[in-house]
Design a protein with these regions (language model features):
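Catalytic activation segment of kinase domains across protein kinase-like and atypical kinase folds
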Residues: 222-261
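Active-site activation/catalytic loop segments of kinase-like enzymes and analogous catalytic loops
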Residues: 249-298, 318-336
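Juxta-kinase regulatory segment immediately upstream of eukaryotic protein kinase catalytic domains
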Residues: 1-35
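Hydrophobic alpha-helical segments that form the core
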Residues: 159-166, 314-327
Length: 378
């Protein structure tokens, strides 16, 4: 388990200052602080009052400390604005009833509401038929947020080119071999430069609406609440480190791509196949239905129809795959990977390799499906 970067005394101080004055009567021996997660650029801790007293109305809260372990502060994957931007998004989600309450913000982190919930699992889509449609509606509401953040589009392909220029395959090969991941051919054979050129060309042809996106819709960032929210829904999106202005298709494409991936026993596992067209079409249909009801832009039937948004999602999903594999390939001699459990690192390299293979398969299918429409086939 990670070492704690926050002690019990500091946890109580934050509880008193931002959560509820009753935390003043809590003593250190009655407090438990545990690690929940370490994201791209922050770490999350659960603080709990374990006393038998019933006087404390809020017995659990979360502390998020900025400063991640996989991505450094100057990594271009992080959109402009950093922690200030992320806190603004979090607060806006709170006010809109879309996410947890923001109790307070301090230098180096923030204090958040603990919402009893569990991470989305693929089986959750089957066990609860509303899950997929609720996620589609939540995403549509998120995209409609009008936020005081940079209105310039976050250029993911620029990030991918940055990774391309900085990568060192010898260092990556040593890291992979250190953990027993011997076949790195998929990573080495991916012609990133040519692929980025192709993506830049096709990006202009696909087009789509630019909105406020989450930028990181893996299942760890999608929770199923124990109790419904004000919309009567249980799906909740969290973690807005990568929120920015970009094409809506990037978020929707991530929902599709990341459906195949989830964590089990602290390792990433491929849990299912890429969602079929029926599933994808149902998701986009619900997304557009909710989007139209929000009425935050002038509707265009040529752009805002199911077929076009499906095309957007299928294309902009490619950007996310390049971004993920770029992060992996750019791990250096001082990479945090060396301090992680071997099984965890192997699982990340496995899914990186799987995603590269999925990229080639989905790209071929994209050209087959949309090649004539976009004049990609002569």
């Amino acid at each position: 388990m990670d070492r704690l970067d926050i002690d019990k005394k500091r946890a109580i101080e934050l509880g008193v200052r931002y959560v509820n004055i009753h935390w003043k009567s809590v003593i250190e021996t009655e407090v438990e602080v545990s690690v929940l997660s370490g994201g791209y650029s922050s770490r999350l801790y659960l603080v709990e009052d374990t006393s038998t007293s019933k006087s404390n109305p809020i017995r659990k809260f979360l502390v998020r400390l900025y400063g991640g372990k996989i991505v450094t502060g100057d990594d271009p994957i992080r959109p402009e604005g950093g922690e200030v931007k992320e806190t603004l998004v979090f607060y806006a989600m709170d006010l809109a009833g879309l996410g947890p309450k923001l109790y307070g913000s301090f230098d180096g982190g923030r204090v958040e509401q603990f919402v009893p919930s569990q991470m989305l699992r693929d089986v959750g889509y089957d066990q609860r038929s509303e899950t997929m449609s609720e996620l589609a509606r939540k995403l549509a509401r998120f995209h409609s947020l009008d936020l005081p953040i940079s209105q310039e589009r976050h250029q993911v392909l620029d990030v991918c080119e940055f990774y391309l220029e900085k990568r060192d395959f010898e260092q990556f090969r040593r890291l992979a071999h250190h953990f027993g991941f011997m076949d790195v051919s998929r990573f080495e054979d991916l012609d990133v430069k040519s692929e980025i050129q192709w993506l830049r060309k096709v990006e202009q042809l696909v087009n789509g609406r630019i909105v406020t996106i989450s930028g990181d819709l893996n299942k760890n960032n999608i929770l199923i609440r124990d109790e419904p929210d004000k919309f009567g829904e249980r799906v909740m999106m969290i973690d807005y480190e990568l929120a920015a202005r970009d094409y809506r298709g990037r978020d929707i494409g991530q929902v599709f791509a990341y459906k195949v991936l989830e964590m089990k026993d602290d390792c990433f596992r491929i849990c299912c196949e890429y969602p079929d067209e029926t599933w994808r079409r149902a998701f986009v249909t619900e997304y557009l239905k909710q989007t139209k009801s929000l009425n935050y832009f002038e509707w265009d039937e040529k752009l805002d129809n199911v077929d076009h948004v499906l095309m957007e999602a299928e294309f902009f999903m490619f950007h996310s795959i390049h971004m993920i594999t770029g992060i992996f390939i750019n791990q250096k001699e001082d990479s945090v990977f060396y301090n992680m459990p071997a099984d965890m690192v192997l699982s990340m390299l496995d899914f990186g390799s799987y995603f590269i293979n999925m990229y080639h398969q989905r790209k071929a299918l994209f050209i087959e499906t949309y090649g004539k429409l976009l004049n990609l086939i002569e």
